[in-house]
């Protein structure tokens, strides 16, 4: 089922820059620890059955229309503003499932920001079962950048924790 959905997404966006994550790389880390040579491992695109237009990065920096750079990483620290300030760029990350927000700071030449985008995980999936022991629940949502400015798009959930089909 996941591949069917991914194929639909690939039709919409045949060229995508994606970030490696601790979830996606788990199989690779376990194989490496067990001593399997890298040559025996299939790449993400082969596993997902997507074309070469999907490119994977550990981290990525792009120039925004306003001239500022924005740095993307799966997750370096729960304090996004500190990471952005140390990078000297705007900054976007995921990883911290219970964090969701935008922080701003200024310097003599510009207004910069950092955005924590939450996650899009199915809280009931086996892959996320480890989270049941934590008191904080995941925040389901994503972020976008329009005209060099960050915007958060939370997934509006009903009382049962399912998407109510509304977009903010």
Summary of predicted features, one role per range:
Residues 1-51:
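Core catalytic region of metal-dependent phosphoesterases/phosphodiesterases
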Residues 14-16, 58-60, 68, 141:
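Generic beta-strand structural signal
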Residues 156-168:
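C-terminal/domain-terminus segments
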């Amino acid at each position: 089922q996941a591949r069917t959905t991914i194929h639909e997404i690939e039709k919409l966006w045949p060229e995508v820059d994606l970030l490696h994550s601790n979830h996606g790389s788990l199989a690779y880390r376990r194989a490496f620890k067990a001593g399997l040579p890298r040559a025996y491992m299939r790449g993400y695109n082969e596993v997902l059955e997507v074309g070469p237009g999907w490119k994977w990065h550990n981290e990525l920096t792009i120039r925004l229309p306003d001239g500022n750079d924005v740095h993307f990483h799966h997750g370096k620290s729960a304090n996004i503003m500190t990471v952005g300030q140390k990078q000297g760029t705007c900054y976007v990350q995921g990883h911290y499932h219970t964090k969701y927000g935008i922080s701003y700071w200024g310097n003599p030449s510009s207004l910069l920001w950092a955005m924590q985008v939450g996650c899009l995980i199915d809280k009931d999936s086996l892959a996320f079962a480890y989270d049941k022991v934590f008191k904080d629940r995941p925040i389901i949502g994503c972020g976008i950048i329009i005209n060099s400015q960050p915007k958060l798009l939370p997934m509006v959930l009903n009382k049962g924790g399912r998407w109510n089909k509304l977009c903010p």
